Amino acid sequence: MLEHALISGAYLFSIGIYGLITSRNMVRALMCLELILNAVNVNLVTFSNYFDSRQVKGDIFSIFVTAIAAAEAAIGLAIALAIYRNRKSTRIDQFNLSKW
């Protein structure tokens, strides 16, 4: 069970990193960042259940990471919406925010 959860967490993390590196769209990059944070949550819960199933430290950390991910998504989408209103594009390679 431990191996399967860690392998799935590693796959999620790898897909998120690959998408974050290769994506040119800001919304897609935010989605890949969320995928990375979900992979971290999978690993936290897996290690928490494997090492000491009586304590819920990994589960509590997972809740905190989820809350931070929700705040990051809200702020990131608000920034993407503001940039889209000004630039009419969400492509990362077209951003030149020094001349806003």
UniProtKB/Swiss-Prot annotation:
InterPro entries on file: NADH_UbQ_OxRdtase_chain4L/K (IPR001133), NUOK/Mnh_C1-like (IPR039428)
Source domain of life: Eukaryota
Keyword Translocase: yes
EC numbers on record: 7.1.1.-
GO MF assignments: oxidoreductase activity, acting on NAD(P)H, quinone or similar compound as acceptor; quinone binding
Gene label: ndhE
Gene3D superfamilies assigned: 1.10.287.3510
Quaternary structure, from the entry: NDH is composed of at least 16 different subunits, 5 of which are encoded in the nucleus.
Keyword Phosphoprotein part of the UniProt annotation: no
Function as written in the Swiss-Prot or TrEMBL entry: NDH shuttles electrons from NAD(P)H:plastoquinone, via FMN and iron-sulfur (Fe-S) centers, to quinones in the photosynthetic chain and possibly in a chloroplast respiratory chain. The immediate electron acceptor for the enzyme in this species is believed to be plastoquinone. Couples the redox reaction to proton translocation, and thus conserves the redox energy in a proton gradient.
Transmembrane segments: 1-21, 29-49, 63-83
Record-linked Pfam families: Oxidored_q2
Reaction(s) catalysed by this chain's protein: a plastoquinone + NADH + (n+1) H(+)(in) = a plastoquinol + NAD(+) + n H(+)(out); a plastoquinone + NADPH + (n+1) H(+)(in) = a plastoquinol + NADP(+) + n H(+)(out)
Keywords for the protein's UniProt record, in alphabetical order: Chloroplast, Membrane, NAD, NADP, Plastid, Plastoquinone, Quinone, Thylakoid, Translocase, Transmembrane, Transmembrane helix, Transport
Name of the protein described by the UniProt record: NAD(P)H-quinone oxidoreductase subunit 4L, chloroplastic
Membrane topology according to the record: Multi-pass membrane protein
Cited PANTHER family: NADH-UBIQUINONE OXIDOREDUCTASE CHAIN 4L (PTHR11434:SF16), NADH-UBIQUINONE OXIDOREDUCTASE SUBUNIT ND4L (PTHR11434)
Family per similarity comment: Belongs to the complex I subunit 4L family.
Biological processes annotated in GO: ATP synthesis coupled electron transport; photosynthesis, light reaction
Localization per record: Plastid, Chloroplast thylakoid membrane
Location, primary (coarse class): plastid
One GO cellular component, as annotated: NADH dehydrogenase complex
